[in-house]
Design a protein with these regions (language model features):
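N-terminal structural segment of carbohydrate-active enzymes
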Residues: 1-117, 122-134, 138-141, 145, ...
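Aromatic/acidic polysaccharide-binding cleft in carbohydrate-active enzymes
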Residues: 20, 273-274, 278, 336-344, ...
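Active-site-proximal helices and loops of the catalytic beta/alpha 8
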Residues: 105, 109, 122-123, 131-139, ...
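The substrate-binding groove and active-site-proximal loops of carbohydrate-active enzymes
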Residues: 39-51, 84-98, 198-211, 227-237, ...
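Hydrophobic faces of well-ordered beta-strands that scaffold small-molecule active sites
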Residues: 13-15, 69-71, 115-117, 230, ...
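C-terminal beta-strand-rich structural cap/linker in extracellular carbohydrate-active enzymes
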Residues: 491-512
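Carbohydrate-binding surface patches
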Residues: 433-471
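Core domains of carbohydrate- and sulfate-ester-processing enzymes
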Residues: 129-197, 201, 291, 299-323
Length: 512
């Protein structure tokens, strides 16, 4: 099967936006009191960020080197993260409604920036109107087949418990504690299947043609509205046949639409050209974290379930082995468009994982920007924002630039600019030059243009004659701000690349 991934993603530097937390524009009138912007985030509090606020940041992001946005869900919802969808055709009024998304798309596209939205199609919110219709009418509702109901509900002998009692909540917890897998209890206890047995998230019965068509039509409609792709939430909960049809419909509307799934591990059979273009690259994220942090990993930071037992310190050889493992399971067309992230709304921030060590964040950013795949910056990482597990990783972006740490923005801008300046970093050969303890050196080469990337995660200054696989008469250090920029050196000596690099630092060397 031909693997056809969008060409523009190879050139993309993404910026992930949590819409409620980037900026209040003042153009959306709140219906009531909001949570203080400066206060620590709470599980349910809304801070009032909106899509017009995202528009106000576009010029800053363009200067940073960003040319693509990934937005967490924007559709009408009763939750601040909006993974509880109430209407798949309507942008949340608190974000400015459909008009605000129209303006964001127009302003982004005018700046040659793409916009990818988050699609939550496995489950809806409890406020989705077909589910409300079912609550009001029971089995007499024509929407009864849109959801996974218990036999008793379908027979009309019991009602759905969408707002369960304390006893029902306790029963769900008791069954989980006894070993029942998440997602298997709610149908019996509540009368309907809910994602992870969370009552607010009824699972959609996508094998039912009208429900399936509703979701597929909404997905296609927003592509025609002008979005440039979909990031898809918990796609493994949905059948492969649905995603094949989804891809056919979406790609018919826009042959260059990007389809990226939230999959936390290897699943190469879904990346063969008939479903997804790419995944959120959490395996690479874990490897970069282990290499850049070394012994600085904060042991008290809560780990996502998918990270438990998988975070460890990597030396240079270990990092390269992890990279090679990913390359072995994915064809190059996929590797080139993987969404390479350091932080997300589902993980503690990279800087917090590393105990606040800015050198670790800088090293990881160097690797993220120079390895194959599309780098994705989580809002606020570029100004040194901290944040532990959800909801702490979803703090409000400081409105006052005086509160920002500008150093990360400087190295992000330099590295993104370097990536944009040469195809060698975007869609070209990657090969190992060597490893040396906690250091790694690799080559990015596109025709006559070649760069060596060297990262030293160790504490000591490194003097290393790196063997070269090409003839290079000259070597020059590419200026990148941050760290000990003035103490990096490189020269060609007897056919090798002799580098001098401080501890906890990295560099890019142009070979000519």
């Amino acid at each position: 099967m031909t693997i056809d991934t969008p060409s523009w993603v190879r050139d993309a530097v993404f910026y992930q936006v949590f819409p409620d937390r980037l900026a209040r524009s003042g153009r959306v009138e709140a219906p009531g009191e909001l949570e203080s912007w400066e206060a620590e985030p709470t599980t349910h509090g809304l801070k009032g960020g909106d899509l017009y606020g995202v528009v106000a940041h576009l010029d800053r992001l363009r200067r940073l080197g960003v040319n693509a946005l990934y937005l967490n869900p924007v559709f009408a919802s009763a939750s601040n993260h909006r993974y509880h969808t109430d209407d798949y055709y309507r942008v949340d009024p608190l974000l400015g409604g459909n008009e605000a998304l129209r303006e964001l798309l127009d302003e982004a596209h005018a700046r040659d920036m793409r916009v990818v939205l988050d699609g939550v199609f496995n489950h809806s919110g409890r406020g989705w109107w077909p589910f409300h219709h079912l609550l009001e009418n029971g089995v007499d509702s024509p929407y009864r087949d849109w959801f996974h109901l218990s036999d008793e509900v379908r027979a009309g002998t019991r009602a759905i418990s969408a707002y369960p009692s304390e006893e029902q909540v306790a029963e769900i917890s008791r069954r989980h504690a006894a070993g029942a897998p998440f997602g298997t209890v709610s149908r019996e206890v509540l009368g309907y299947e809910a994602w992870w047995d969370l009552p607010a998230l009824p699972k959609i019965r996508l094998e039912h043609p009208p429900a399936r068509e509703h979701i597929l039509d909404a997905s296609e409609s927003w592509i025609r509205f002008g979005i440039d792709g979909w990031r898809l939430d918990v796609p493994e909960e949905v059948t492969a046949s649905f995603w094949r049809e989804f891809r056919t419909r979406v790609r018919a509307a826009n042959p260059e639409a990007y389809i990226v799934g939230e999959v936390w591990h290897h699943k190469p059979e879904w990346l063969r050209g008939d479903m997804f273009d790419a995944f959120m690259n959490y395996p690479l994220n874990r490897a970069l974290l282990g290499f850049a942090a070394q012994d600085r990993l904060d042991p008290v930071v809560p780990l996502p379930v998918e990270y438990e037992g998988k975070i460890r310190a990597y030396d240079g050889a270990g990092l390269w082995a992890a990279i090679q493992e990913l390359d072995a399971v994915n064809p190059p067309e996929v590797t080139a468009v993987q969404l390479n992230l350091l932080s997300s709304h589902d993980t503690p921030r990279f800087l917090t994982f590393c105990g606040g060590d800015l050198d670790a964040l800088r090293l990881a950013t160097l690797l993220q920007m120079t390895l194959p795949g599309a780098p994705c910056i989580y809002y606020g990482d570029e100004i040194g924002m901290a944040g532990s597990a959800d909801p702490d990783c979803r703090r409000a972006f400081p409105a006052d630039p005086g509160e920002w740490d500008h150093a990360p923005s400087e190295w992000v801008a330099d590295l993104a600019g370097l990536r944009h300046s040469s195809r060698a970093f975007r869609d070209a050969e990657l090969s190992l030059l060597g490893t040396n303890g906690a250091a790694v050196a690799y080559l990015r080469r596109d025709g006559d243009e070649a760069f060596a990337v060297v990262a030293n995660a160790g504490d000591e200054r490194l003097r290393w004659d790196v063997p070269l696989t090409l003839a290079a008469p000259e070597a020059s250090v590419v200026p990148i701000r941050g760290g000990a920029a003035g103490e990096r050196s490189a020269a060609i000596v007897d056919g090798a690349l002799r580098i001098g690099l401080p501890g906890r630092d990295g560099m890019v060397v142009r070979l000519s």
